[in-house]
């Protein structure tokens, strides 16, 4: 559902079926942003985020958690402490998702990159 929304909004979406696959793909083809649920198979979204933020190749990639995970309700700061840049509770609308993503990726596109 989210992939369809994002594709319709003009984003190039790559999907992973579990946390390890997402991590491997991010290392090989670093995305502009990682959008993840916190409750995913394999390594969960918390561990996925910690590993992404702990690796030099992917530490600068923003992570948006979109979740209805029960632990989020009892401790909303847990995802942020794991390294998520933002958290969006489910259910969310297509507009809410797009706005959250653009808030995270647009500042990156404005950064001045040093000459190589």
Regions found by a protein language model. Name each.
Residues 66-67:
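Hydrophobic/aromatic residues positioned on beta-strands within the core alpha/beta folds
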Residues 15, 40-43:
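Residue-level signal for the "D+5" position in two-component response regulator receiver
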Residues 41, 50, 59, 71-72:
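The feature encodes the CheY-like receiver
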Residues 15-33:
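Acidic, metal-coordinating helix/loop segments flanking the phosphotransfer/catalytic sites
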Residues 3-8:
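Charged docking surfaces used in two-component/phosphorelay signaling
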Residues 92-101:
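C-terminal output helix
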Residues 12, 34, 38-39:
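The short loop immediately C-terminal to the conserved phospho-acceptor aspartate in CheY-like receiver
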């Amino acid at each position: 559902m989210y992939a369809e929304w994002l594709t319709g909004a003009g984003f190039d979406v790559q999907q992973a079926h579990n946390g390890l696959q997402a991590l491997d793909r991010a290392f090989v083809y670093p995305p502009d942003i990682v959008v993840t649920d916190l409750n995913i198979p394999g390594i969960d979204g918390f561990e996925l985020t910690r590993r992404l933020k702990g690796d030099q190749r992917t530490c600068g990639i923003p992570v948006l958690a979109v979740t209805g995970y029960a632990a989020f309700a009892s401790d909303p700061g847990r995802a942020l402490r794991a390294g998520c840049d933002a958290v969006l509770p489910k259910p969310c609308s297509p507009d809410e998702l797009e706005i959250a993503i653009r808030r995270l990726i647009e500042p990156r596109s404005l950064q001045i990159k040093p000459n190589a």
